């Protein structure tokens, strides 16, 4: 049976509402996309995000001697790193491909980022054979990734695994553009989670690799927002850090999606790493509630009014001792670097995980 080269679904011309539908006039094309993938490629449209039973799919790899390429989002590492992959794939060897290097400041040395990735993986007892930093957008280090795969695969099957939206399909397309003259863009690419439905095996001269379904991560904030808001939240180019010197009893809004209250501490600097399209707005703590009530979905946008009505906010109070430079991370949004002793109240929406780590930058 012929399959869609975008998602791997079996093509059919009978039911437009079912997976794999294609107009019968197009089904005989050599590189055919189903209607859903066609809409995703041309309009970034996805009317139904499918939650795949990825545990069953990945478990099929357990009985194989394979190499796993685990692709993670450097800007949202902890939310896209999947330590359970080791268990689900039978303890097969793994390479970590840390994508979206281009979003982090160029001033940060690659070795520091690699050490950070290894440290975070080791905390979950996840031992990687190699860590490669990549950018599917700029094609940085794609050659290094392929060379590492060839080195460690040793003739075995290679599986690409990762959460939806980490750039897995874009990485594969980058490999194809660099190493294949015939098929320039055979994997569907979109900002919508869950666009790859089934295994897709691709043969190159020196090795073959298999794309697996993007893991639908229910903790990701993108699952609650429109594509327009997502495009503002997800950085498209190098982050421009915003340094703010704050007195205690000051508040900083990250659009309408997060609120940073400097509750107590001496005057100090905080560095905000978020998408350049998100507003970082400072005000007095005593004025913050009123400002939020007046400006949510206006100045503080995203979220839109419709999105805001469906969001739930929660808060945490965190104390920093100033002994180490730390990151206060809002998964899927960004992070704030804190270097001095202080007390912070952080508020954000359900779906965003609040946690701290040793500073990345």
Language-model regions, residue ranges each:
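Hydrophobic alpha-helical positions that pack around
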Residues: 169
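Histidine-anchored nucleotide/phosphate-binding helix
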Residues: 80-93
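Short amphipathic alpha-helical segments
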Residues: 81-84, 108-110, 221-224
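Switch/connector loops and helix/strand junctions flanking conserved nucleotide-binding motifs
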Residues: 79, 104-108, 142, 218-219, ...
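Canonical P-loop GTPase G-domain recognition
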Residues: 93-95, 103-166, 177-178, 185, ...
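Conserved beta-strand elements of the Class I
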Residues: 67-70, 159
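Helix-rich effector regions associated with P-loop NTPase G domains
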Residues: 2-68, 75, 92-95, 101, ...
């Amino acid at each position: 049976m012929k399959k869609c080269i975008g998602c791997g679904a079996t093509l059919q011309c009978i039911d437009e509402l079912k997976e794999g539908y294609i107009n019968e006039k197009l089904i005989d094309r050599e590189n055919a996309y189903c209607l859903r993938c066609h809409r995703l490629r041309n309009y970034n449209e996805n009317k139904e995000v499918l939650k795949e039973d990825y545990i069953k799919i990945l478990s099929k790899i357990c009985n194989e001697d394979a190499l796993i390429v685990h692709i993670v989002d450097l800007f949202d590492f902890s939310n896209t790193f999947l330590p359970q992959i080791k268990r689900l794939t039978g303890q097969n060897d793994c390479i970590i491909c840390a994508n979206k290097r281009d979003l982090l400041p160029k001033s940060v040395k690659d070795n520091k980022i690699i050490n950070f990735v290894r440290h975070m993986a080791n905390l979950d007892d996840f031992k990687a054979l190699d860590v490669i930093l990549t950018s599917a957008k700029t094609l940085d280090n794609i050659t290094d990734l392929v060379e590492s795969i060839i080195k460690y695969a040793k003739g075995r099957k290679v599986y690409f695994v990762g959460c939806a939206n980490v750039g897995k399909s874009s990485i594969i397309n980058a490999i194809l553009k660099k190493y294949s003259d015939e098929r320039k863009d055979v994997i569907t690419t979109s900002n919508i989670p869950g666009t790859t439905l089934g295994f897709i095996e691709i043969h190159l001269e020196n090795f073959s690799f298999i794309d697996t379904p993007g893991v639908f991560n229910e903790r990701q904030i993108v699952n609650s927002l429109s594509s327009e808001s997502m495009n503002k939240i997800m950085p498209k180019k190098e982050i421009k850090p915003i340094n703010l010197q704050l007195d205690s009893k000051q508040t900083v809004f990250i659009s309408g999606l997060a609120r940073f209250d400097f509750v107590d501490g001496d005057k100090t600097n905080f560095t905000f790493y978020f998408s350049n399209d998100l507003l970082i707005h400072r005000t007095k703590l005593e004025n913050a509630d009123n400002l939020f009530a007046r400006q949510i979905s206006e100045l503080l946008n995203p979220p839109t009014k419709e999105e805001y009505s469906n969001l739930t906010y929660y808060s945490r109070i965190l104390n920093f001792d100033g002994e180490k430079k730390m990151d206060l991370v809002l998964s899927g949004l960004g992070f704030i670097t804190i270097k001095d002793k202080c007390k912070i109240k952080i508020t954000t929406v359900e779906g965003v995980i609040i946690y701290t780590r040793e500073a990345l930058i």
